UniProtKB/Swiss-Prot annotation:
The keyword Flavoprotein is assigned to this record: no
Listed GO MF terms: ATP binding; cysteine-type endopeptidase activity; RNA binding; RNA helicase activity; RNA-directed RNA polymerase activity
Domain Peptidase C3 positions: 930-1136
One BP term from GO: proteolysis
Name under which the protein is recorded: RNA1 polyprotein
Annotated site residues (Cleavage) in this chain: 308-309, 904-905, 932-933, 1140-1141
Any one Gene Ontology cellular component term annotated for this protein: membrane
Organism per entry: Bean-pod mottle virus (strain Kentucky G7)
EC number: 3.6.4.-, 3.4.22.-, 2.7.7.48
Length: 1850
């Protein structure tokens, strides 16, 4: 089959009616295709008749749209082209609706017959036959179609009025004839054409002066738009009210038929012959109108992706450019038709200009019609000549108002000059052909802009200015810094639309700023490469400032020039200022570089001549605390440029804000302060050297030529003398010499005008109205003022002042008026405009009259689209107006008045939340919303935190921000972006540039949305995580109410307006297919709702109430039928590191408060949740005589804010801020390269220490809980300590810590199944591999002795962190072998955890330090535990994994456990805090990790300091050879070899660490401002000194101040006061012995004499102490406990005796038995007949019977395992004690008593005997012999006679 333009329709009819075609169609119907949809397959089988009709319509349309001759094989036409056509138009969702409309439209268009389909043909049997109801409206359309050609034939040349009247008359007549119900139902129809007239009249007011001669074109286009819109509205209203059941594409029928008729007539009547190409071109234009109107008002059955961004001009741009085969297609393609042309223009006018250029070229080639109007219109629209001329006039006004131009104004003027020169260049080269008038217009504009530029760039402000924006490129030589700066300059010039002459290249060696003309960009290449005076660094300081800065200029006319450039770009090999730069403060130089870029080459990437940036890497650095930190690293130039643009825009906003807040702004001043200076300038400019010599000798009344002024047809030369007298000499306007003087006077006039503006001698009235006085027509030939200022009444008030103006002032103002072409009341712009209109209006009108109608319609369509502003506003309102009765009502209200109704607004700032974009912007209801809707705090949070937009050109896409530098977006837009593109991210608070990388956008399975992740995105608060419903499919019911939230850009105002609407949603579980052009994607489950969504709605959020809070449940992605919307459910996204498990007990704040870098207050515990904390100290002050007259500066710490010691002091109202202050400011990031090197060096040392027997696998839970017997450093977990949160909440009275969650005998313990700890442990082991676990710690004040200054001067109590029990268990499992290795190898490694200070280890430590010399740094850190960052912790995890190995799972688990410490939640009383740094003190690895961190810091500092000092490389690689380091937590000693002392000293170390936010001081004198080397004997370590006893022995005496405090305060937690004091006294004597044996001897004697109860045998002699130390030195046992209090822990001491399970049952009496606990659990002692008494069994109360008695005794020192005296007195001797009462009660009920124990039965047996005697089960006659014999063998129990006499006698 052959198709060609102008083909007779009979040929096509013959083709589809032939038998051969019928046979091929039958064969085609019989052959099924795999890609056939279900509906299409059914049609082929059941309804081939419909497909026959569709093939006929397909061929008819193929023929009518043929552009050139095309021939197809019949089989290929059917099986390929027709098949693809059916696949595109028949879908399972839309079924045959679109196909039927296509057939009806084609047959009505070609045959003027309406095709009716019977009920069988419809898809649903319930569909009502529409033939009757639609007949009237169908006849209306066909009649309208037939009328238009006839009417056009009558009035081919009719004007605007006849067009409107004819259309309205026939339109109303047909409605009345065929569908009178329309007038009854819709009275607004009568107002349609009245409003069309209003639209055209309004457009005429707004119409550009250039278009005054083409109103007829505008009328054509407006009538087509209005008619199409009206038909679409009528049709939709009829559907809404049920008068017809479906659309008949009336708009398409109307516009296509009307145009065809018009073409047929114009072929015969027009001046130019209309050919088929012009018909096709015009058909495309009006078809675009039909498409837009149909999509707006005709519901589509197909589910369409609603980010189409299509309008009339977009459709025209797509189809006309393709059809005309012009170069527009090559302008770039991005996403949609809109973006094909978007790169060529920035607004609608530009697109229209390009289209008119296409049409102009098209008709010139086809018709030979060389249209001046089309050529001129194409240029004027595409280049926005009108706006260009307006801006030039605006610049003139700015100069006259201020007598100078600011740098911002100057940038605008420069862009205008560049644009004008570009247009002039195009005209000169012949690229653009326009009429002479337009050419002259552009030339005049260029001349005026250049003239203003020449003069204004010498006039600048002398007030406070914007600080210039500085980009500083640093790097080694030959890395391309200069090329990079040049590239940045080019891109900034393009961004600002200025030319290359806007860049000034500064040579710092030049004392003058030669050639500086206030260029906005200044560049300095090879900054500071050459020594200059002053230095380049010194010159930069005043330049980058807001203070006025006059610069040194060579020429006299340039004197007074001030620097005000806004951008500076430098390249340099030097990062820091030179020492010879003579800068007193280096920070002043550093702070002046806003973007500091270190340029380096990518290793392994070759140089590319086509793009030198491909092998460059850019490190953005900032100076922070004495150190340069790499903030960001960019691998591509595009990312760097986006960052620079973002920083530039923020800098400009900041400067504008700062300038706007300055009060008392300094008044402007000109360059001249008196008249004499003005005269001197005139003399210097206008006279040669000889005359100037004579003038010096001239008298004051000698006249001097000053300037020439133009006035109408004359040139007046003005002469002044020193007295201010003026004479005028006229000259002819044609005299060449006079013209030269006039042109040369322009600069002088500008200077003189500035003098008048700012000279105080100028009359105040004149200065006020100076800009209005600049007018050539206001002065006669003698410069008398003849004008009028303001109203006549106002002018009369100031006339006297104006008449008194000196003659020379009037001459200046008249000359300025001539110079700037200002006459009468008009500006330069109005004058140019009126001249052009007078000349070209009639020319255009005459030309347009002769055009063929199709060309009028094409051009009119384009013009009406641009100018119909009010129409498009109404159109947008009606498009969004909903369905049904709501739609009809909105249409009626719209046509009742010419103004668009606004929906009621909502303001979200009724809630107290953080700043966001919507605070001062009303949130509006959607147009189709009927009722009100709620707006609570959750919605405000969603809009302010999560809602954002991505702008690309003029395209704006809504996106959903997700915590973790991510956003969710719709696929049908973002999947079409295949190349990197620079976009703008607009959030609620700000906007920033970003380079979108399509490789980082990943679609979710079976969903239309995807996730984009990029580290260069700015993150949102992580508290927003709870605003998402991550499990919508399970959480949401099938039907629910929700709100649709959107925020789209208003293209008119340029602002974002949030909108909302309530919707009723349904979970749609049937698959849908979302289409957008060729894009198709299947979505299995969707949210469906009734909503009149429109294009650009994609990205709107569906927010519903989930539980008690509103959450985001869906993301709008498509619409269907004009009334249905579809949203994707929010898929699950892996969360970022956030603590979640304990949040059930928390109430979070909407906004974080007291937020600092490392810590923030985020919430509080819920009401009723209480975490017990100590409020009373366990430290008891001893009696005065016990203190032995020794000094003590330490007292118990403050544990509560209500401490009575603070009452009445300034600290009475102190808060708990002391605990988090150490986390407020973590250390600065470290250089990753050097940190990795340091870590690798440490790991290599670890490997050097590994023995064959060392293993690092994880241990079992049993080993983690119980330790390993006989293996050093593998002790069991302390069970007396707290169990952590949230387990502590379930603790009952009498239960203690971790012990209530374990069971077993004394040696083998295990977790009790079913407890909260056991469940949390199991969950943690499962989840640990996947993510960093939740970690919630309790901050508990530490009960310890502190110096008085930390109590009264500045209260500061240390806290320790209690972590959950299950977390500590898992940590022990994964790291116990590593900890054992580090402690065991302390003799070789720097870490000294486990050192025994009494042993020879101390001597070995001293020798290690002295091996490098006796110059030692003794250091102390401030807030050490809060310094560590995730960077360091992550590196530490790598180090441990490198040593310990294991599979990927185990290494990942270790990493997650360590990282959990650096991102956790902390509970301090009722407050919940987020902590993002540091190591919690309750972490099992705290001391080990702190030790490793301490060593890393010292090694890192060593590496950096030696590198900076350029020390020999051998020193860098030999840390162990030159440094001897020992660390224990935050304690360290650093012995420095004399070779490296010049590079690594205390002062250098202190300064370097301070630059990283780390404060380090002298460990001995913490108040010292310096850190100096000390001798070993002057240092301390672990609060112990180094004392040399002999050549081979060093001892470690503890600081005496710490010793004396032990005698003033004792801990009575586990001991009685006397026993606790005795323990402390023995320890003090042992320590004091190391200081001096004689001093220890004197103290022992004094204690025995002063303390009465003290026995000599209780206190060891000096000989015994000496033997103690001798024994310690020969032992190699570790000291795994940090202080004496831990040594007294019952978990470590246990009950005296061997900890072996007892298997003996001991009967004291038939009513009293001692047995092992296991016998009870075996059922041998049933609770109904026995009273079980558990003694120190550690069983949880919940695991024991209610009747059981639990006895937890506190063992006394030296009491043979029995409890303390106080406990015996209160529990045993006291007959009314709780235990005694329960025993007697049980005996009264006939029960027997059984004492149960898990370990040594001896102490429990004694207790059983004592209780038995006390409660008369046993008699003293029986117990006396037994106890007497026992005392003979166990002397330590002799106290029983005195304490328990009842056991011996009655």
């Amino acid at each position: 089959m052959k198709f060609y333009p102008g083909q007779n329709i009979s040929e096509i009819v013959y083709h589809f009616q032939s038998n051969e075609t019928a046979n091929r169609l039958d064969a085609y119907f019989a052959c099924g295709c795999e890609e056939d949809t279900e509906v299409l397959a059914r049609l082929k089988q059941c309804n081939p008749r419909l497909l026959h009709l569709s093939y006929a319509a397909f061929c008819l349309e193929m023929g009518s749209h043929s552009i050139e001759e095309m021939e197809y094989d019949d089989g290929e036409l059917i099986f390929s082209y027709f098949q693809n056509f059916l696949l595109s138009i028949v879908s399972n969702s839309s079924k045959t609706t679109k196909l039927r409309a296509y057939i009806r439209s084609a047959f009505a268009y070609h045959f003027q017959h309406f095709v009716e389909f019977d009920q069988y043909t419809n898809d649903s049997l319930n569909t009502v036959d529409t033939s009757v109801s639609a007949q009237g409206i169908a006849d209306l359309a066909l009649s309208m179609v037939r009328w238009i050609p006839t009417q056009i034939k009558k009035v081919v040349n009719f004007g605007v009025g006849s067009v409107i009247e004819s259309f309205s008359e026939h339109f109303n007549k047909l409605l009345m004839q065929y569908c009178p119900i329309v007038f009854q139902a819709f009275s607004w129809v009568n107002n349609i054409w009245t409003m069309v007239k209003e639209w055209i009249e309004e457009a005429a007011k707004e119409i550009s002066w250039f278009l005054q001669g083409c109103k007829e074109l505008h009328a054509w286009g407006m009538c087509i738009l209005a008619s199409s819109c009206a038909l679409g509205l009528v049709e939709k209203c009829l559907i809404s009210l049920g008068m017809i059941s479906e659309s008949f594409d009336l708009v398409g029928l109307f516009v296509r038929s009307a145009i065809v008729g018009a073409f047929c007539v114009s072929i015969k009547t027009g001046k130019f012959v209309t050919n088929s190409e012009l018909i096709t071109c015009a058909t495309i234009a009006v078809s675009t109108i039909a498409t837009v109107m149909s999509q707006a008002f005709k519901p589509s059955e197909e589910i369409k992706g609603q980010f189409q961004a299509l309008s009339v001009l977009e459709g025209l741009a797509t189809q006309l450019t393709s059809f005309c085969d012009t170069s527009l297609v090559a302008m770039g393609k991005t996403c949609t038709a809109f973006n094909q042309i978007c790169t060529a223009g920035k607004n609608v006018k530009v697109i229209a200009g390009r289209l008119l250029e296409v049409v102009s070229n098209f008709v010139r080639k086809l018709l030979g019609l060389d249209s001046a109007f089309l050529r001129d219109a194409a240029l004027i629209f595409s280049q926005d000549v009108d706006g260009w001329l307006r801006n030039i006039s605006w610049c003139q006004e700015q100069f006259l108002l201020k007598a100078y131009m600011s740098q911002d104004d100057l940038i605008v003027l420069r862009s205008l000059v560049v644009k004008g020169e570009r247009m002039r260049e195009q005209m000169l080269e012949g690229e653009v052909k326009v009429s002479p008038s337009v050419c002259n217009l552009i030339v005049k504009g260029c001349e005026e802009a250049n003239k203003l530029m020449r003069e204004s760039r010498l006039h600048c402000s002398k007030t406070i200015r914007k600080i210039p924006f500085v980009i500083f490129a640093h790097g080694e030589s030959r890395v391309g810094k200069s090329l990079l700066v040049d590239r940045l300059i080019t891109d900034f010039c393009d961004h600002l639309e200025i030319g290359e002459d806007a860049v000034y290249s500064r040579n710092p060696s030049d004392p003058f700023w030669s050639g500086y003309r206030r260029q906005p960009i200044v560049t300095i290449d090879d900054f500071a490469a050459v020594v200059s005076e002053p230095s380049a660094e010194a010159q930069l300081i005043p330049l980058v400032s807001s203070a006025p800065y006059p610069i040194n200029m060579a020429g006299l006319e340039e004197k007074g020039m001030h620097f005000d450039s806004q951008i500076m770009m430098c390249s340099s090999n030097f990062l820091e200022p030179s020492p010879e730069a003579k800068i007193r403060d280096d920070m002043a130089f550093r702070n002046r570089r806003h973007v500091l870029i270190t340029v380096e080459l990518k290793p392994g990437v070759e140089y590319d001549e086509s793009d030198f940036t491909k092998n460059q890497r850019y490190l953005l650095k900032t100076w922070f605390h004495y150190h340069y930190v790499v903030d960001q690293t960019f691998e591509s130039y595009a990312d760097l440029l986006a960052h620079c643009f973002t920083k530039w825009e923020r800098h400009v906003k900041e400067q504008e804000s700062n300038l706007s807040q300055i009060k008392g702004k300094k008044s402007e001043s000109g360059h001249f302060y008196n008249f004499q200076q003005l005269m001197d300038l005139a003399v210097s400019w206008n006279l040669n050297a000889d005359i100037m010599k004579n003038r010096i000798k001239a008298e004051r009344n000698d006249m001097v030529y000053v300037f020439s002024a133009g006035r109408k047809d004359k040139i007046l030369h003005c002469f002044l003398n020193k007295e201010g007298e003026c004479t005028v000499r006229p000259d002819s306007i044609d005299d060449p010499e006079a013209q030269a003087l006039l042109k040369a006077s322009e600069t002088m006039l500008m200077k003189a005008y500035a003098f008048l503006k700012y000279n105080n001698a100028t009359n105040l009235i004149v200065r006020t109205h100076l800009a209005e006085l600049v007018n050539e027509d206001f002065y006669d030939e003698k410069f008398n003022f003849i004008g009028t200022i303001g109203t006549p009444a106002f002018h009369r008030q100031i006339a006297a002042h104006l008449e008194k103006m000196p003659l020379w002032q009037k001459a200046i103002l008249c000359g300025m008026g001539h110079c700037l072409s200002r006459k009468s009341k008009e500006t330069w712009y109005t004058g140019m405009k009126e001249k052009f209109v007078q000349m070209m209006k009639s020319i255009y009108e005459t030309e347009v009259t002769d055009w063929p109608v199709p060309l009028k319609i094409i051009s009119g369509t384009i013009l009406a689209t641009i100018l119909g502003t009010t129409f498009w506003k109404l159109f947008s309102f009606l498009r969004d107006a909903g369905n049904g009765g709501v739609f009809v009502g909105n249409v009626a209200s719209a046509f009742t008045t010419s103004s668009v109704l606004e929906a009621q607004s909502r303001k979200p700032n009724r809630y107290e939340v953080s700043q966001y974009r919507y605070r001062n912007v009303p949130i509006k209801r959607r147009a189709w919303v009927e009722g009100q809707m709620s707006f609570d705090q959750s919605v405000v949070a969603i809009m302010s935190k999560c809602k954002a937009s991505m702008r690309m050109g003029n395209t704006d896409a809504q996106i959903l921000m997700v915590p973790g530098r991510r956003f969710i977006a719709h696929g049908h837009f973002f999947k079409n972006l295949t190349q990197k593109v620079r976009v703008q991210i607009v959030t609620s608070e700000k906007s920033y540039w970003h380079v979108y990388d399509p490789d980082k956008f990943q679609m979710f399975d079976n969903s239309e949305i995807g996730l984009y992740t990029n580290p260069t995105l700015e993150d949102i608060p992580h508290s927003a995580w709870d605003l998402f419903c991550w499990d919508s499919e399970k959480t949401l019911p099938n039907n629910f109410s929700a709100e649709l939230l959107s925020c789209k850009l208003d293209t008119v105002t340029g602002q974002y307006y949030p909108r909302m609407a309530p919707i009723n949603c349904r979970v749609h579980r049937q698959p849908i297919h979302i289409t957008e052009g060729n894009y198709v994607r299947k979505q299995d489950v969707s949210i469906e709702y009734d909503a009149c969504t429109i294009p650009n709605d994609c990205g709107s959020l569906v927010v519903a109430k989930v539980g008690n809070h509103k959450q985001i449940v869906g993301f709008h992605v498509a619409g269907s039928k004009g009334r249905l919307g579809y949203a994707s459910l929010i898929p699950y996204v892996e969360p970022v590191v956030q603590a979640q498990s304990a949040e059930v007990y928390f109430d979070f704040f909407p906004v974080e408060v007291d937020s600092q870098e490392g810590v923030a207050h985020i919430g509080e515990l819920k009401s009723g949740v209480y975490v017990p904390l100590p409020t009373k100290t366990n430290l008891v002050e001893t009696p005065k005589e016990w203190q032995l007259d020794l000094p003590c500066d330490k007292i118990p710490s403050v544990l509560t804010t209500t401490d009575e010691r603070l009452v009445g002091t300034e600290h009475e109202d102190m808060t708990h801020s002391w605990w988090y202050s150490k986390y407020a400011t973590p250390m600065m990031p470290l250089d990753e390269e050097i940190l990795s090197k340091v870590a690798q060096d440490m790991v290599e040392e670890w490997f050097d220490c590994v023995d064959e027997e060392d293993t690092f696998e994880e241990v079992s839970l049993s080993a983690a809980l119980n330790g390993v017997e006989g293996l050093d450093y593998m002790e069991r977990i302390p069970l007396a300590t707290s169990e952590g949160f949230p387990h502590v909440l379930s603790r009952k009275n009498g239960e203690k810590g971790k012990r209530r969650f374990v069971t077993g005998d004394g040696e083998e313990m295990s977790l009790i199944p079913g407890t909260s700890v056991e469940e949390a442990y199991n969950k943690l082991t499962v989840e640990l591999e996947k993510c960093v676990p939740t970690l919630v710690g309790i901050e508990c004040p530490k009960d310890e002795k502190l110096p008085r200054r930390k109590i009264f001067d500045k209260p500061k109590t240390r806290c320790f962190t209690i972590l959950p029990m299950e977390f500590n268990l898992v940590v022990r499992q994964k790291f116990l072998n590593f900890v054992r290795f580090i402690m065991k190898k302390r003799d070789k490694l720097s870490c000294q955890v486990g050192i025994n200070p009494y042993s020879m280890e101390w001597t070995g430590l001293a020798n290690r330090l002295l091996s490098k010399g006796n110059d030692i740094l003794c250091c102390d850190y401030a807030s050490f535990s809060g310094l560590i960052t995730k960077q360091v912790m992550s590196k530490m995890a790598e180090m441990i994994n490198s040593l310990c190995g294991g599979d990927e799972k185990l290494m990942r688990e270790r990493t997650h456990l360590l990282l959990a410490c650096c991102s956790r939640m902390a509970i301090c009383k009722k407050d919940i805090w987020r902590v993002e740094c540091g190591i919690p003190s309750g972490f099992p690895l705290t001391v080990i990790c702190n030790s490793i961190f301490n060593e890393m810091l010292i090694r890192y500092s060593y590496e950096k300091l030696l590198r900076q000092a350029k020390a020999p490389s051998m020193f860098l690689q030999s840390f162990r050879n030159f440094i001897s380091l020992c660390v224990y937590g935050d304690d360290n000693l650093i012995s420095v070899h004399e070779y490296v002392k010049p590079y690594f000293s205390g002062s250098k170390l202190k300064s370097f660490l301070a630059s990283h936010n780390i404060t380090i001081t002298d460990g001995i004198d913490k108040t010292s401002a310096t850190l100096q080397f000390r001798k070993l004997s002057e240092c301390d370590f672990l609060k112990r000194n180094f004392k040399q006893m002999s050549n081979v022995l060093w001892v470690a005496p503890e600081d005496k101040a710490s010793l004396w405090s032990q005698l003033h305060y004792v801990s009575c937690n586990n001991l009685e006061m006397q026993e606790a004091y005795l323990v402390n006294l023995v320890n003090v004597l042992r320590e004091l012995y190391l200081h001096s044996p004689e001093e220890a001897r004197r103290l022992r004697r004094k204690a025995l004499s002063c303390i009465e109860w003290l026995q000599k045998a209780d206190v060891p002699t000096i000989a015994q102490i000496e033997e103690f130390h001798s024994m310690q030195r020969i032992m190699n046992a570790p000291d795994s406990n940090d202080n004496i209090d831990l040594l007294l822990s019952i978990d470590l001491l246990g009950l005296q005796g061997a900890a072996r399970p007892s298997q003996i049952r001991l009967w004291f009496d038939d009513k009293l038995v001692l047995a092992n606990t296991q016998e009870f659990f075996d059922g041998n002692f049933p609770a109904d007949s026995w009273l079980p008494i558990f003694v120190n069994c550690l069983y949880p109360v919940s695991q024991l019977p209610a009747e059981a008695v639990i006895v937890n005794v506190v063992c006394g020192s030296g009491r043979g395992g029995l409890p303390t005296t106080a406990w015996i007195s209160s529990a045993v001797n006291n007959r009314s004690s709780d235990i005694n009462k329960k025993i007697r009660t049980a005996l009264g009920k006939g029960k027997k008593i059984v004492f149960l124990t898990r370990v040594d039965p001896f102490p429990v047996a004694l207790l059983a005997v004592l209780f038995g005697v006390k409660n008369e089960i046993l008699s003293s006659n029986a117990t006396n012999p037994m106890l007497t014999r026992l005392l003979e063998n166990c002397k330590s129990l002799k106290y029983l006679v005195d304490e328990c006499p009842f056991a011996f006698v009655n």
